[in-house]
A protein has these predicted regions:
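Hydrophobic alpha-helical scaffolding
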Residues: 6-10, 57, 61, 72-76, ...
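Phosphate-handling DNA/RNA-contact segment within nucleic-acid enzymes
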Residues: 2, 14, 29, 105-119, ...
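Conserved active-site segments centered on acidic
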Residues: 81-132
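Conserved phosphate-handling catalytic cores of large alpha/beta enzymes
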Residues: 282-283, 291-335
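N-terminal structured subdomain of primase-like DNA metabolism proteins
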Residues: 1-102, 158
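Conserved small/polar residues in nucleotide/adenosyl-binding loops
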Residues: 3, 333-339
Length: 339
């Protein structure tokens, strides 16, 4: 963690009015500045910024804080990410961070979990290309995916043995306590792989590190799609599938889809700015994450009742994040072709 003196210097060199004015329009009102709150929908400005106190407060929704908390909330940053962003803004070079014992243990755990996820993703990928993975490969082929697309997204297959990955990782020396933290296993009836007989979709963060998985069952078992649980690495509400690729697409919008196959099919068709909300319920955190990379979002959820309702729920969330939104009419499609 950075010293309190260094953090205070970062804050003092970033005038809160200048910083917030880069995100929303502020108007001077007496000794303060006011504007429309970026954290909730409103027609009359209730968001106040005090230059003398270097604080902001919304009288509508109650949020408030200093320049660091504003950047954290608006950009969906961690505390350290916000400090680094503000330091970069004013050309400050930050020293290497010294961590407490607890913080270092947390970092070490996350490093190990990333290592396990990378091994698991590689294992699933090789399973897909093996004789045992033909059912998964056939599924992907029938949906028109090329080898290039399969490789680009690191798609895999989990196999039909419900203990295969567990044994594979145990043979590599990982202990049960660590494996339990990974979210890759269930414990209701002994230790079993969470994903088996499923086509696997590695979920990556913006730095292309595997933080979780999605799996589509081969057959009629339920649920059809299964995601990793929340772990030290994976928070579904703060990530978007495909953003690691889409953020470098250099397009003037992002396309939000419902599922993994929707995104992959979009990318293969040339729409490499497509992402998925890991389910139909878009969150404010995901909307703010998109705002980092674009000002416009195109919604392409399924045209069934659930998809339509999800799109209607998403529109105000995207608007609150400062994103303009358009809904693409998918009624020409009579079935979920990418399922």
């Amino acid at each position: 963690m950075y010293s309190s003196d260094l953090i205070e210097e970062v804050v003092s060199r970033n005038d809160i009015v200048d910083v917030i004015s880069g995100y929303i329009k502020l108007k001077k009102n007496g000794s303060s500045y006011v504007g429309l709150c970026p954290f909730h929908n409103e027609k009359s400005p209730s968001f106040s910024v005090s230059q003398s106190r270097q604080l902001y407060h919304c009288f509508g929704c109650g949020v408030g804080g200093n320049v660091i908390t504003f950047v954290m909330e608006y950009e969906n940053f961690t505390f350290l990410e916000a400090v680094k962003s503000l330091a970069d803004r004013v050309g400050m070079e930050l020293p290497e961070i010294s961590y407490s014992q607890k913080e270092q243990q947390e970092r070490d755990l996350k490093t190990k979990l990333l290592e396990i996820n990378k091994i698991a993703a590689t294992y699933y990928y090789h399973q897909l290309k093996s004789e045992n993975g033909q059912v998964g490969l056939s599924y992907l082929r029938k949906r028109g995916l090329t080898d290039e697309t399969i490789n680009r997204f690191g798609l895999g297959y989990s196999g039909q043995n419900s203990k295969a990955l567990y044994r594979y990782l145990k043979d590599k020396g990982y202990d049960d306590d660590l494996l339990k933290e990974s979210g890759l296993f269930t414990y209701e009836r002994g230790i079993n792989d969470k994903f088996w007989n499923r086509v696997m979709f590695p979920i990556m963060d913006i730095n292309n590190k595997v933080i979780g998985f999605g799996g589509r069952v081969m057959g009629d078992a339920k649920p059809k799609y299964l995601n990793s649980p929340e772990t030290k690495l994976f928070d579904k509400s703060r990530n978007l599938y495909g953003l690691n690729i889409a953020r470098t697409a250099r397009k003037n919008n992002l396309i939000i889809c419902e599922g993994y196959m929707d995104v992959i099919s979009m990318h293969q068709a040339g729409f490499n700015q497509a992402v998925a909300s890991l389910g139909t319920a878009l969150t404010p955190g995901q909307a703010r994450l998109m705002k980092r990379y674009t000002d416009q979002v195109l919604i392409t959820y399924d045209s069934d009742e659930a998809g339509t309702k999800a799109a209607m729920r998403a529109i105000p969330i995207l608007k609150e994040a400062g994103l303009s939104t358009k809904v693409i009419n998918c009624l020409l499609y009579t079935s979920d072709a990418a399922d």
